Amino acid sequence: MAVVAGLVRGPLRQASGLLKRRFHRSAPAAVQLTVREAINQGMDEELERDEKVFLLGEEVAQYDGAYKVSRGLWKKYGDKRIIDTPISEMGFAGIAVGAAMAGLRPICEFMTFNFSMQAIDQVINSAAKTYYMSAGLQPVPIVFRGPNGASAGVAAQHSQCFAAWYGHCPGLKVVSPWNSEDAKGLIKSAIRDNNPVVMLENELMYGVAFELPAEAQSKDFLIPIGKAKIERQGTHITVVAHSRPVGHCLEAAAVLSKEGIECEVINLRTIRPMDIEAIEASVMKTNHLVTVEGGWPQFGVGAEICARIMEGPAFNFLDAPAVRVTGADVPMPYAKVLEDNSVPQVKDIIFAVKKTLNI
């Protein structure tokens, strides 16, 4: 009987070993994360990773931020690394720039980028130009971040898009996330960069949840600054946007697809340095271009893209003039109906695409 039992147990042990060897842990599933939570997670991971990183701004600490983007960080890291400041943008931006020059890595939050005008000398003259003026000897590793562009019912002094303003300045890097993956990957890359980086968020996107893929859940996840992403493949026309209008472009593309028009939608992610190569490659394939932005038309991001295409190799591939969809050339009105008509809507993008394709 012992011999028989041994003969039985032997194969069972072998089978058990095979089962164990074949067992593997499944990859982490995608999770739903709001843009607000993604920025918070990215800052939290970098604060934990590098003790030189700190956050300062109005109400970022005990109040968890005006838009709750810094929720929980003050309780975790304390007064020395999450710092409430007086209402003086020039003052706390200057402190942040000085700290960056001294070797720290500050994250300077503006409650809205409209208020960054109070600190424009610190951002442009002190932060953006110093690395170059010092022949590369004095880096200024600082992130200026906060909500940018149109919001809801806050009128002209709280609704301006500053992508073109800051994208105009050599020495700055400018990023503009759309979804949660963008937000987390770009804030982490911005914090680690030795150049001053302006991160233009959008108040209306903070509470919007997106699927965060498994790779983006890693603490090592970064999105390279200066690289765009094709959000939707297409063959008939290239549509380029950044920030919230990317979502509008995808909605328009879905509508147009039902009519047999396939749009290639490019999410810029970075305003400066701009990934013009990605746009050129797409235009060479589709032979048509529409740009979409929430900012004003004159000297805007779309105008720069059109100029680059005209001056580069993709121009000879265009079958029709490029078309821009922009915000209205007026200060943002307060009245709801006027406000809605002052920023690009899905119908405006559809109209521009059909105009470009002569449909």
Swiss-Prot record:
The lineage of its organism: Eukaryota, Metazoa, Chordata, Craniata, Vertebrata. One of its GO terms (cellular component) is mitochondrion. InterPro entries: PDHB_mito-type, THDP-binding, Transketo_C/PFOR_II, Transketolase-like_Pyr-bd, Transketolase_C. SUPFAM superfamilies: Thiamin diphosphate-binding fold (THDP-binding), TK C-terminal domain-like. It is found in: Mitochondrion matrix. The pyruvate dehydrogenase complex catalyzes the overall conversion of pyruvate to acetyl-CoA and CO(2), and thereby links the glycolytic pathway to the tricarboxylic cycle. The modification N6-acetyllysine is found at K354. K(+) binds at I142, A190, I191, D193, N195. It holds the Pfam family Transketolase_C. Its main location: mitochondrion. Residues 1-30 form a transit peptide. This is Pyruvate dehydrogenase E1 component subunit beta, mitochondrial. The modification Phosphotyrosine is found at Y67. Its EC number is 1.2.4.1. Its cofactor is thiamine diphosphate. It catalyses: N(6)-[(R)-lipoyl]-L-lysyl-[protein] + pyruvate + H(+) = N(6)-[(R)-S(8)-acetyldihydrolipoyl]-L-lysyl-[protein] + CO2. The record marks D319 as: Important for interaction with DLAT.
